[in-house]
Amino acid sequence: MDTIGLDETTTIEINNNSNNKHSSYSSSSSNNNSNNLIISKIPNKIIDSNNNKNNNNNKNNNNNNNKNNYYNINKSSKMDMDYLLDCVQKTHGLIKDLTDSMLISNDQEERKQFQKQLNESNNYLNELLSKLSYIKNNNNINNNNNNGNINSNNGTSFGEIKSIPLMSNETGFTNNKITNNFNYSENKNNNNNNNNGQEQHELFSTSNKIENNNNNNNNKINNENNNEKNKNNNNGQHIIPKIYISDHEMAPNSEFQNIDSISPSSQLICGESRLTPVSERNELTSPASSLPSLPSLPSSMPKENKENKEPINQQEEEEEEEEEDEQKKEEENNLVKMTTVQVENTQEKIPLAKSATISTTNKTIEIEEQEKGMDSEKLKKTIKSSSSSSSNLFNDFPKPFIPFVQSNYNTEERNEVLQIVKLIHYEYGVQIKDKTGQLDNYMYNINFNPPPQYMCNSNDINSNNINSNINNNNNNMSNNLKKKLLIISNEKRNKMGPQIQRSPEETYLSNHFDEEELSNYFSHSFMSPKIVKSPSSSNLNKINQNNQNNNNNNIINNNNNNNNQNNTTTNNKNKSNNEKNNDNNTVFNNNTTTTNNNNNNNNNNSSEKNKVIVFEKKEPGQFIFKKEKVAKLSTSLSYSNLSSSSSNGGTAEDEEYDRYYDSFHCVELVDEDLLVYDNEDIYFNDEVDQNKSPLISPSLSKSNTTTTTTTTTTTTTATYANVNANAIATIGSSRKINNTLSPNMNNNNNNNNNNNNNNNNNNNNNNNNNNNNNNNSNNTSPTLTTQENNGISNGSGNGGRKIHYRSLSHGIIKTPFTNNKLKTLQIFVPTEPYTCRLEITIEENVTVERLLIEVIDLCIKERRKIQYHKRQKLQIQQLQLLQQPIITTTTTVAVQSNNNNNSSNNNNNNNNNNNNNMTSPINQSQSLTSSTTSSNISSSSSSNAFSPPTVSVSNQLISNNKNGNDFESLTFPFLIYTNHRDFILKKSDENGEIDQTLQPIIRTTEIKKLKTDCFSLVINPKAIRDTTHHPQIFRVHIIHSSNNINSNSNNNNNNNNNNNNNNNNNNNNYNNNNNNNCNNGIVKSISFSNIGEVDQSSSSIAPSSSTTAATAATSSTTKDSVAVVYKSSSTLASIKASICKKENLELNLCVFMTMSNEVIQNEKITLVELNLPSVKLVYDQIKPIQKSITPFQSEGVVGNAPRPITKLLGPIFFFTPDNICEIKQYVVSKIGKLGVKKDRYMEISKDKIMYSQFDYLPSSSVSQNGFHNNNNNNNKEYYGGGVGGGGGFTNYNNFSNANLNNNNNNSNFGNGNGNGGINGNNGNNSGSNNKENGGTGAGIGGGGGLQLPNNNNNNNTTPLKNNKFFRSFSSAVIKTPYQLINDISGVGIIINKPNSFYLKCNNKNSEYSSTDADEIVAKIQFIIRLKKENLI
């Protein structure tokens, strides 16, 4: 075989498959360009002398070198190190993901598989590190060697010839020659003596069996040599072949330092691969099978030592030539096709491999050859084996890989807000050193990889700065977030493999957020919630709902049935607990958890306890309540079971209720987005004497649960202290709206309870009353305690679900946002009739003034929640009363007899019973004879829907009534002062008693300087005003525009009746309310604004009987009315702005109207000038434009409109601002060619133009005019008949600009034929085109109306003007003339469609397109964020 020397210029013509062009590469010995390809022959006479110990193996090595030839590719070893570094980073990421999956998994077999895969990954990582170490050492050796680099494979068989060893040094190529013969084999006898057991690198794959015999003969020598070489190779150092499978450009100047210091435990950020395998990728199967494969390399790389060269005998040369001749013959016999290589105008045939791909930095060269007679099946097997082994975890790069594979059902991209939050949690979680922080890190570790330009270079790869990208200052962390967000914005999730088992945490993190969750996540933090888990809450909700419906349908029968169940359950529980039951309503008991089984004494029958979750805002010290809603979760042991099954032991009825899950703490909640007050103060222990304080509960001082430990929760809670009985309750519960019975808050006398249980067959209603509403007061000194459980629970005691709490048992912790310590304080607030105790956790460096602001803000929020709770219950009552039949007299008599039996069985203890019989009209006789106050009577009157008391409770009632609904009577009279400067803070003892001798605390004092933890909020004496009488109230009734017309006539009479009732005494008020219940079926609630408190009995509203259940349901999200403190300087505009902000209404779509439905045009008028006791605020309605206002008020009106309108429509339009609408609504008039004027009504909302779909305003806003615009698909306009005559419009073409001044009668809008008046005939609805004959009629009213067909399809829309985006807002998809920003709950870009985006309204996505889609999306997202933050 002829050879080609390096001193000769070599030109190789190669067919490049990528571009089907010929490219020539030339090089010389002095050329060091990485793109040049040099083919030479290794001389037959080579002496391998690594050191003196290897001199005996030189001859064997020389013989082996003659049989294995390689390419010499001029690439620096730095490229090898880049490639290995990428592998190291990916392996680190794989190890981290496997570790996370193993910790999350609850299946033993799955954990074993993860452990096995983790071990394989660690072994592979060790191999990579050893190769890096070898390259480093080899480079050091080459730097000292100036005589060239002789490559010897030391007898190592590369098996299938997966790679080509590198031969290069700093000065370029050596002067040695290599043959043009390529020896590829399918040898399966790999080097088994390599320390790290590296895998075969599949750069080339061939099935040429010609060299099998040669390589098999070499393997014996190779193994012997390797055994000796490996003894001297302590680190298992290997060389990496310089073959790259990448179309990406590599980093040319990357250098690595401290390679030996890399350990498998080093935490590298997993980066994107800069290498894309040429072979086709397969789908990801498992992490273990996806390890990137590396070539098997020689165990040592001896360098040339010319001093130790020995001459080669002539006899050896002859033997070598004979072997070459034999090899040529074998090749010719096997029909190896020869590839032509031109060398200085001469042609020589060189045997090449069947397929070879050499990927350089920028270009890919392919040398292909087909073997004659090659079996196709064999070729397929070769290709299959190559592609399957080359498929690894890093397929489909440069996409980043994620820890959890997306499921098939979730095809939408993940919400950006969720990604941002989770990334923030990940960045903060990495900095935490304790175990709990690691668990948090596992939960929120999204592991999004930065792009290659952000990957750590060689300077970052050492043990000191492995995590430099994470553990640096805040600037670095924010930079990392920005880098990762770049990936999120451009990433579209595709499924990357088969489904895997998903835990609830994974399910939550992969789901989209709804509108409420988006707002919650802006204030998410690491604060630990105070939560006591109990699965019986949803069961309690269902039972309460059933009781509510059953009692309304048939009071006697259903009460008997319910009480039979209650009594049966009560008897069983009393026997099991030695006739000492702490909870009155044991039908709600759930014995499914081990907590109840081991804690029967104190909370066996307790339902859901108080749960208040407090999360810290971005600003330290600010708190917010938060709930997260996810799909219904199962408490089974399997994480993959995410169906809506009920809790362990729970009934199937639980499935109808949503469950809530705190993803950060892995705690399932049963609650809605608003917190509700609940009372859990009265829990007795069997060992506690009944005569002693009932407030000493072992459940509050020690933990009897089966979990290892539970948490101490420092959250913002509030407890009530009874003025007389000093009872204590806690603010906050996780209960649904209809969950108002709260049986766990009722304290039964066991003697009475047992007595009633013995007589339950005769007195069903009595037992129900006693089980739910008996309360024995024990006037003893209170012991203020809160729930305290110590430690951390990481086990699966709670239904098999992992629970993690952050330990706060030491009381003082550090927040992850700052280094400041947190301190828990108890603050007593002067609420009525109970004293409220707030427990707040805040930073130590916060001043007293800041603490006062937080306390006042919290009280305002709590008062809103109480009012919201009242409103919801009364609305439920309205819905159910409308559906109930009239109660007969027979029923009344039967119930009264039961009530009499009840009083006798209670041993005339009526003073201590709050007797709610779940009936409304029957309790009148009993309530009038009892000694309870009017609030108790009013409460029992509406107890059918669990109605709360409607007035402040007197001291006598406080001492006698500890019903669970007492919290609803809690008022905040001190909030008439909303400025924090009106309050001062004083030190107090643990019972809230203030030492009057002490001076108030200075407002600038820091919390950490105060020695005590108990304080009291006191109104500043300088701010006290005359509060002996309630201030005069100006009431604003909030009504939807669709409900305003239907209830016009009846509301006035009902409101007048209610105003008269307000002046009556309590009994008369009760009777009038009962009459209203019988006649109208509805009693609307009263709600307060933040300005002041009023007596609820002073202004109760009874709406009209025409109000339907649907109307009540639609108005459930908005208050019925708002009471405003009457001030002479208050204007309607300021009141409107305040109400719209708090009720989340669009300011521009709200109109003030009098109670007689007259629009109040001037909103700048004061209350004194208005001189009205109440007004209506009609929302979702456009204010009518007065006819006196014309589009041409002045000459210089052109350009008056804001820039968006001017830019959009141009100077052809004239704009007149509607001064009444506060420059928010505009009249747009267009002058046509013939001088015809068309008007449009437009509005500006958040830099977006929204305009109407009609030329005229709806009839609801201009009821005095006799026309109506129907916005349905038919687009018809109906006109009422004129006064005194028939006829109509004839030959009228421009009817859109019709003058309707003559239509003064009140016609029936929308019916198609207006009734002209008394005895008037119906109009004629038939006609052709624009010529219509109006109907003639006799009588006073004249003829009826006529119907004009709308032939102009575009007369109701604004000219398009090349703006698709704004036209889309008025499309049929949104179905509203104005697209409100409040309706948009989500917005995002559609990746697969350029210039397209979607809006999410009413849980439906609408797709739109615009040339500036990115700008539109950014603006709307910013608006949504601002609105959510304002709502928070």
Curated annotation (Swiss-Prot):
Q: Where is the composition biased (Low complexity)?
A: 14-72, 208-225, 284-300, 536-575, 583-607, 691-712, 744-779, 896-944, 1321-1333, 1347-1359
- Bias type Acidic residues, positions: 315-325
Protein's name in the database: Putative uncharacterized protein DDB_G0267840
Which residue stretches belong to region Disordered? Answer: 1-72, 208-237, 280-335, 531-607, 690-712, 738-801, 896-950, 1044-1076, 1303-1359
Q: What is the lineage of its organism?
A: Eukaryota, Amoebozoa, Evosea, Eumycetozoa, Dictyostelia
The protein's superkingdom reads Eukaryota
Q: Where is the composition biased (Gly residues)?
A: 1311-1320, 1334-1346
